[in-house]
């Protein structure tokens, strides 16, 4: 089945539906069936600011789900992975407490432009999710992002690959040496390992799920809930606990987007 999804979409979806003030900027290629579908779905979201590119094709992601709920992604990259700083000119006067970027866009040919934008963007703190391909991103781009002291949000395996270290805590400490900022590493049903500083690492226990349907979008929803908690003045540990609860609900659902009923049950909405 077709469904709207993707990293930043899932992050913004949690924030927007919870009543947070969020601006979701994403390019959409209008060529082909995928672009038309994506544009139509995004038009329904009050927080979405799609940049329509009429002469470019949009990509898609095929999600293969195993019996235990784990998933494998096969992506066809299109316009949605691109970036042009001109798209952000209308937001230059805004001020954002937090901004989100994932590594899939950084590795693209326009990724250097995105990194340059991040350096001078009206964003106080970046949350950066390097993703499963983060270790393969150009080192200079990664170093430039790390110099901005972003909060890293990644899985335990991603932390190991990106740092080149075997143990999770060793990996987080090695990454912290480069970012000098907190880190959240998700560890599945066990919850999250949170590094606050070089002397403080703690485990935030997972929240039980009644059943696991699939894990599509779970990590992205976790990142969105972390940003939601931080935007409401929570500590990073409390924000991670909130995110664990949201993540537990997402894995009980088919696909990346919670139904209105399931989202309401989380009690996140503030008007």
Question: What is the meaning of each model-derived region?
Answer:
Residues 168-271:
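Conserved phosphate-binding/catalytic region of the ribokinase-like
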């Amino acid at each position: 089945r077709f469904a709207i999804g993707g990293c930043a979409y899932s992050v913004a979806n949690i924030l927007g539906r919870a009543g947070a003030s969020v601006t979701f900027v994403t390019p959409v290629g209008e060529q082909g069936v995928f672009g038309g579908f994506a544009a139509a779905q995004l038009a329904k979201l009050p927080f979405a600011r799609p940049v329509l590119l009429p002469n470019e094709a949009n990509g898609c992601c095929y999600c293969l789900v195993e019996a235990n709920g784990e998933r494998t992604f096969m992506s066809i990259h299109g316009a949605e992975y691109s970036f042009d700083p001109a798209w952000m000119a209308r937001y230059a006067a805004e001020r954002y407490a937090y901004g989100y970027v994932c590594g899939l866009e950084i590795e693209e040919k326009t990724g250097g432009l995105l990194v340059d934008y991040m350096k001078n963007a009206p964003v106080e703190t970046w949350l950066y999710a390097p993703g499963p391909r983060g270790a393969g991103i150009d080192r200079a781009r990664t170093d430039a992002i790390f110099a901005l002291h972003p909060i890293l949000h990644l899985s335990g395996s991603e932390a190991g690959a990106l740092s080149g270290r075997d143990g999770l805590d060793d990996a987080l400490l090695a990454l912290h040496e480069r970012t000098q900022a907190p880190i959240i590493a998700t560890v599945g049903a066990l919850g999250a390992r949170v590094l606050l500083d070089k002397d403080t690492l703690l485990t935030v226990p997972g929240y039980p799920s009644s059943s696991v349907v699939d894990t599509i979008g779970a990590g992205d929803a976790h990142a969105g809930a972390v940003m939601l908690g931080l935007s409401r003045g929570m500590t990073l540990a409390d924000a991670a606990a909130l995110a664990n609860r949201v993540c537990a609900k997402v894995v009980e659902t088919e696909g990346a987007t919670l139904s209105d009923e399931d989202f309401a049950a989380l009690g996140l909405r503030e008007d």
